[in-house]
């Protein structure tokens, strides 16, 4: 039964690819809606709009610091250090000229093509959500809808996970790319398993911190969350 449903899902993905691209995919290389305007170094203890903009810019680059409140506390200093480490900069937790200049550049994109895990409208996109930052996209689909691997890779997590994820599958791909599939009702893979792109990994559910059935989908590059829609513009069903 699962095999037949997966075959049908792949056909639908191939037939609907251009419609989805026109309706919900972000344009390639889309830049975040905010940039760091400050030229003055920002450090622990700072407050105000420049700090809030720094928090947003770091989140867009995949290094969220918790609540976006315009206050430079320990969490923000930690996010700055993680960004500096990933960028090969001196790690000091201070957003100086070089750090700020790199944050003005467009966020990184996935270095491999990714396919849609399922075809569905986007509920919550990647980006600010009130005073928090949503690190993935929510794809709205009926409970039980098949969820497919976005690319070939090895399963690194398959099971319940605390923190609101519910039933979660994570897959490690090439070039430091990792994909995450949360709130699943059923998981069909196990840790260590090698998957082809488009393989069935589970089914849509509402486990964990979810108010209704949907797939929370994340893409991370060397640990930094990126906008999944920018990574999915190729739209092949698990290339």
Which residues are covered by each model-predicted region?
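Acidic, Ser/Thr/Pro/Gly-enriched interdomain connector segments
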Residues: 2-15, 22-70
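Zn2+-dependent peptidoglycan hydrolase active-site motif and core
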Residues: 134, 150-188, 213-218
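Conserved, short, structured surface segments that act as functional micro-motifs
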Residues: 169-173, 193-239
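Short acidic, glycine/serine/threonine-rich helix-capping segments at coil-helix boundaries
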Residues: 41-52, 56-101, 208-210
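Surface-exposed strand-loop junctions at beta-sheet edges and helix termini
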Residues: 141, 150, 184, 189-190, ...
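Intrinsically disordered, low-complexity Ser/Thr-rich linker and spacer segments
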Residues: 33-40, 97-119, 134, 234-239
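Surface-exposed, glycine-biased beta-strand/turn segments
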Residues: 105-166, 197, 206, 210, ...
